[in-house]
């Protein structure tokens, strides 16, 4: 039994690391954070950003005249690095929470992560993603 547990820990430590970046509307952040926490995501970085996609932002007017060109809209960027939670699970949760069927629901980007280093302890890889930091 102990041998199986060690094999599982070794597999987790050598597991592929992935970074999921979600760009979405600010008002969806709290609900998404709660949903991700329920599936075991216990860390993320959130940044206030601006951007536009298909919706091209809202129309801007200056002294009653429409100003051409897209307007940057406020969004949030959520960054998550995982090893033990399947990327597909995180993507599914994000899609369920963010979907309205309207333009501007957001985007999800998935990247491979080569390495991670915890500065305080020097731990790398899987171990750097564990613990209280």
Label the model's feature ranges.
Residues 2-133:
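Positively charged, small/polar-rich N-terminal and surface patches that mediate targeting and assembly
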